[in-house]
Amino acid sequence: MKLALIIGAGASIPFVPSLTSSFLTKELRRWDNWTGIISRVPSAINVSKRDIRRIVRGILSQTRKETNFEHIIEIIDKVCGYYTNNKKSLFNKEVNIIRRSNKDKGGSRNCYAIIPFLAREIIADAISSSLKNGLDSELLTKQGEFIKFLVSKSNNVSIISFNYDYVLDRTQNAINSKDYPSPSFCNGFTKEASDGYELDLEKLTKASNSIVFPHGSILFNHKYNGRRLIYNSSYDEAEADRWRSLKESYPPKQTSVGQHGVNTIDFNTFIVSGQTKETTMKNAPFNRLYQKAVDDIYKSDAIVIIGYSFHDEHINSVLSYYTETRKGHKVIVVDKQEINDAVDG
């Protein structure tokens, strides 16, 4: 029997209560975070920090207060892609934002090229700071015990995480230790490199017990013009490596490695965010990670879903197809229930 465990943001919140969408939105809107991250832009790449600040302030000023961080990143990607991609046509929404933000009066292509990277670094820093405040070891143990329980029921378990954090990574380390004699999980990053572990898609595809991060991770880093995806063992190493890559090669390849679309560049970064995830899924290696996730979901005899918000259409369509075509197979959804929530019966 094959099992699939799908983990969304709600699965991390018990470990780190602050890791909510509203928290990440506040951090992305916080101007101090932007001034801090912009100040880190290396002078060697010769872009105007003043122009970057002006562009970002203009974009943020035109987004509604209720807009969450993924929508903000979507707008950032499209506006910056518009200018990085020689001003190809856009939908009216983005054109209006550009006009109202007065973007046509300045800012080089290089300025626009770096902003999507900076936005994701703010998100990554916010997540890392929350995690550094301490992960509950008891909860990590419980998550490990739950995964161990699934493995006891099946020798073919696929874990699909849509989270950017490294909560599951720490659990995986425990699962693969001597304390857990169950079969080890493979996340595909098995090729040792001087700067971390490189993705081996063949091993990931063949792994019976696997962990897949189709939306990326704050531990990821693109190297060598985006041709290699590296997994670092710590956030500090991953972050330092990303900034080194930025200094060595500009415009930043890890934000412009995606192909030119009809309206914009697909910003294929270390984390896949925004409301344009489906577009990024066309690009390697995220397309292969997504294919692995889809394949494992469809081949599963049962699916357990924890903390997933059902906001990603590229995943919802797969689950919908599964329930319609795999009659009699179970889909178990685990969610938080407040004490005063109404319960039938």
What are these regions (language model features)?
Residues 169-173, 222-232, 315-318:
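A short secondary-structure junction signal
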Residues 46-53, 232, 236-295:
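Acidic, metal/cofactor-coordinating or nucleic-acid-engaging core segments within structured domains
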Residues 177-203:
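Short mixed-charge
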Residues 1-16, 21-59, 67, 201, ...:
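SIR2/sirtuin-family catalytic core signature
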Residues 138-147, 192-197, 286:
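Short linear interaction motifs
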Residues 195-234:
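A recognition module on extended beta-rich or small alphabeta surfaces enriched in W/G with H and D/E
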Residues 159, 211-213, 331:
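Conserved beta-strand scaffold positions in the cores of enzyme catalytic domains, especially
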Residues 1-170, 174-184:
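Gly/serine-rich nucleotide phosphate-binding loop at the start of the catalytic core
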